[in-house]
């Protein structure tokens, strides 16, 4: 174990799955398929072995958060205010963050049927393409400087204080922020925040996004495996884009397969891999839990902060 993981307890899949006794997955195969991202691979057994114990662990943290909030209120002689439980999920492009986020949202909704469970992605806090072009940053999209961190931190602050908050909406089909469209959040019980940058402290030194998190997860994998998944996903996106001339990726959809693969590999090497190695992976040890994936997308190791 490297020094980076010295403060984590390594748990094998076999050991982890014994931490939950229920054999029921809480969702159907059809529901699981509907929330699984392109070229991701997850089974009902993965839900039972990995995610049901994870739901148990999140409940442990939520109870601890509520107890601490109660004790603080007594100490300060103030009325008790239950705040939203915020979960941050980070990891590389194409590693499976979206699948994990949607699955957790569904499972938390099933295990807490009277609770409001919401999901937001930090893609919505990217600057619009026009602004990135004007600043000469379009080729740096996804890097720290391409996010409106002040807006994102203000959003999280509003959520944490029980206020109604609004998030911009990003479309991968148009590769841009959707003008005049907002996603509203009205004091949810749980909020899942998913994005490559959720543990970073970009342009603002006041605080980290993770200061607002009650629990946090990093999805990890060998970069060579993620490269393969990224290229496979890119090819799948091109197939879909052929049917929609307005899709951003339609301009690449007619490329011969070999050229499309070469293009995707170049983007991976010069954009996504650089971003991963310089800005995303170095934040890994800020997570409470690291889920490591093997080449077949299966989670084989779990690291829990001590």
Curated annotation (Swiss-Prot):
Primary location class: cytoplasm
Disulphide-bridged cysteine pairs: none
Q: Which reaction does it catalyse?
A: (R)-pantothenate + ATP = (R)-4'-phosphopantothenate + ADP + H(+)
Q: What is its EC number?
A: 2.7.1.33
The pathway it acts in is: Cofactor biosynthesis; coenzyme A biosynthesis; CoA from (R)-pantothenate: step 1/5
Name this polypeptide is given: Pantothenate kinase
Q: Where does ATP bind?
A: 91-98
Cellular-component GO terms for this entry: cytoplasm
Pfam families the record matches: PRK
Recorded GO MF terms: ATP binding; pantothenate kinase activity
Give UniProt keywords alphabetically: ATP-binding, Coenzyme A biosynthesis, Cytoplasm, Kinase, Nucleotide-binding, Transferase
């Amino acid at each position: 174990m490297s020094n980076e993981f010295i403060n984590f307890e390594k748990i094998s899949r076999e050991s982890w799955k014994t931490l939950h006794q229920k054999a029921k997955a809480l969702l159907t195969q059809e529901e699981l398929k509907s929330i699984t991202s392109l070229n991701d691979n997850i089974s009902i057994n993965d839900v039972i072995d990995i995610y049901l114990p994870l739901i148990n662990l999140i409940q442990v943290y939520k109870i601890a958060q509520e107890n601490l909030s109660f004790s603080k209120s007594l100490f300060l002689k103030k009325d008790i205010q239950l705040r939203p439980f915020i979960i941050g999920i980070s990891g590389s492009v194409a590693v499976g963050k979206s699948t994990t986020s949607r699955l957790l949202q569904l499972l938390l909704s099933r295990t807490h049927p009277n609770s409001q469970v919401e999901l937001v992605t930090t893609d919505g806090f990217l600057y619009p393409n026009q602004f990135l072009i004007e600043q000469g940053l379009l080729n740096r999209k996804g890097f720290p400087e391409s996010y409106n961190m002040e807006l994102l931190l203000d959003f999280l602050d509003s959520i944490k204080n029980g206020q109604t908050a609004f998030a911009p909406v990003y479309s991968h089909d148009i590769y841009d922020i959707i003008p005049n469209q907002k996603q509203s959040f009205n004091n949810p019980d749980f909020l899942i925040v998913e994005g490559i940058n959720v543990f970073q402290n970009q342009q603002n030194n006041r605080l980290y996004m993770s200061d607002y998190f009650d629990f946090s997860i990093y999805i990890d994998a060998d970069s060579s495996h993620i490269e393969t998944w990224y290229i496979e996903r890119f090819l799948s996106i091109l197939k879909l884009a052929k049917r929609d001339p307005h899709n951003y990726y339609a301009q690449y959809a007619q490329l011969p397969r070999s050229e499309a693969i070469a293009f995707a590999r170049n983007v991976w090497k010069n954009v996504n891999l650089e971003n991963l190695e310089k800005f995303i992976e170095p934040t890994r040890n800020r997570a409470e839990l690291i889920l490591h994936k093997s080449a077949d997308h299966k989670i084989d190791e779990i690291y829990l902060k001590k």
